[in-house]
Amino acid sequence: MVKELAVVDSQSNRVSSYVFKRPYSWEEVPALSARINQAIDHWCNWNDGDVLYSELETVLHREASYAVAIYCFGPQKTRFISGLIDRTVIDITQLGCPPFADISLHGISCTFVCHNFRHICALRTAYSLAQWLIFHIRYLQYATCPT
């Protein structure tokens, strides 16, 4: 399930952030899933959100309409997004991307004030990953320059 989605267009340096409404009530979540979700919720409240969850695919298609490739962090997110959109989806960890804590740009402001104290934010993470990817691509270009 996607609660927060951030998109960075590296060509235009445009960022977008979406917080999705809950797809169903908390009471409908099985007990085990509820405990797991509470442990990894990144401090997003289940009731937060302004975009209908049913709009997730529409948002992805709109945001990726001009993209050649989409980069996700980790195999689980990569598989999930691959199942929703007909684009090349690349797991950025396969390119050697380090953990978030090693690349986080702390100057980026987040939508939720509580995130600013916890350094967990989809927007900050996406922007940090995009900056790492740009650096990585440039490094590869210069590493292969003829001498």
PLM regions and their residue ranges:
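Conserved non-catalytic scaffold segment of RNase H-like nuclease domains
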Residues: 3-75
